[in-house]
Regions:
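General structural signal for secondary-structure boundaries
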Residues: 1-2, 9, 66, 97, ...
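Conserved catalytic core of two-metal-ion nucleotidyltransferases
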Residues: 107-152
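Short, conserved charged micro-motifs
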Residues: 98-105
Length: 199
């Protein structure tokens, strides 16, 4: 601030250590890794996507995972753009994550989906609060998180619907946190790929 560079050396040393032990690259990085796989029937895709998006918009959630990357890919070249699919792949920030997860479950059940489960995952210190995983059959379609601070986002209008999409710095801060947490339900290569793509 105000031209003060006294902390730059300390920051640079920390950044060098971070890059040494957690480099922002993955040898297995392919565009297919950006999104979670989906083994459900193809006709389920649009119903799940539309249901999750409608609830997220209605509850003013912020998108920051696979779907957000899918939207950002539209600003990339055609080769990159064509690598993305419409697989149900959502990470949401919600003021009331438990309620949001249960609404997704209820609305999908109203559309005749079966075997929908919600898994609660514990938070970590003051960095990550409890969060909820929505699973349809064997496919994880959505994680819902509670914000731990004010997070910046952009509003993107698509067909008169306003989507709150996390800014790149917000997305990267979550992705890096997920890498360090080393939870079994996070695919590190996938997270590194998404981070590389945004960076």
């Amino acid at each position: 601030p105000k031209g003060d560079i006294s902390r730059w050396e300390k920051v640079m040393k920390r950044a060098a250590l971070l890059n040494k032990y957690y480099p922002l690259n993955s040898e297995k990085c392919k565009y297919e890794n950006f999104q979670r796989s989906f083994e459900g029937k193809p006709e389920y895709v649009d119903v799940i996507n539309n249901t999750v998006k409608a609830i997220a918009v209605r509850e003013q959630c912020i998108f920051f995972g696979g779907y957000a990357n899918y939207l950002y890919s539209k600003y990339m070249n055609k080769t990159v753009k064509n690598k993305f699919s419409k697989h149900p792949d959502f990470d949401l920030l919600s003021i009331h994550p438990k309620e949001t997860a249960h609404r997704i479950k209820e609305e999908l059940e109203n559309s005749d989906f079966k075997n929908i489960t919600i898994k609660k995952h514990d938070g970590f210190m003051d960095l990550l609060k409890s969060h909820y995983e929505v699973i349809v059959n064997k496919d994880t379609i959505c994680f819902v998180y509670e914000p731990i601070a004010c997070h910046s986002y952009n509003v993107i209008k698509i067909k008169d619907i306003r989507y709150r999409i996390a800014t790149i710095d917000t997305m990267l801060s979550f992705y890096l946190l997920f890498i360090y947490l080393d939870k079994p339900y996070y695919n590190i290569d996938r997270i590194l790929c998404m981070s590389q793509f945004l960076f």
